[in-house]
């Protein structure tokens, strides 16, 4: 099984995560940010990852440090759990609708860190979560996992719906890209390395 445990402690945050890529979608999330907990729960459930995240951060300042650092920790956890990446499917694109919102997420488990994010969000906050932190989370996650990640809003207006569709689509896309293809042998690259 592809599993990882990652801890990260700074003067701003203290974060612990457990991940099982080949899970059932079980989750235990406690970041102190209700809406973010909900999004990470959706991510795990729809990606079929078993995920535990416990985060303590300087929420008296704002949610930025906690959200970004959870992205760093989860990126590292996925990198560690993915191992040598032999026989993975590598690529995936997933569309998720949430009422009027439609989001497309494309993933390449490439070893090359890149984020393209086009998510215009009208609301500055959803609950106590600053919506600009969606992109901060995605960037930290992509760069620490070493993946190319494209996230685009195709249409929609409700910020909650857009963000929810994003986290669900990310979970689904990663589930597909990390799946083992029994037909494939070795690393899915002509270079022989990812």
UniProtKB/Swiss-Prot annotation:
Stretches assigned to coiled coil: none
Pfam families in UniProt: IGPD
Keywords: Amino-acid biosynthesis, Cytoplasm, Histidine biosynthesis, Lyase
Pathway connected to this protein: Amino-acid biosynthesis; L-histidine biosynthesis; L-histidine from 5-phospho-alpha-D-ribose 1-diphosphate: step 6/9
Swiss-Prot/TrEMBL GO biological process terms: L-histidine biosynthetic process
EC number: 4.2.1.19
Record NCBIfam families: PRK00951.2-1, PRK00951.2-2, PRK00951.2-4
Record protein name field: Imidazoleglycerol-phosphate dehydratase
Native source organism of the sequence: Thermoanaerobacter sp. (strain X514)
Gene (UniProt): hisB
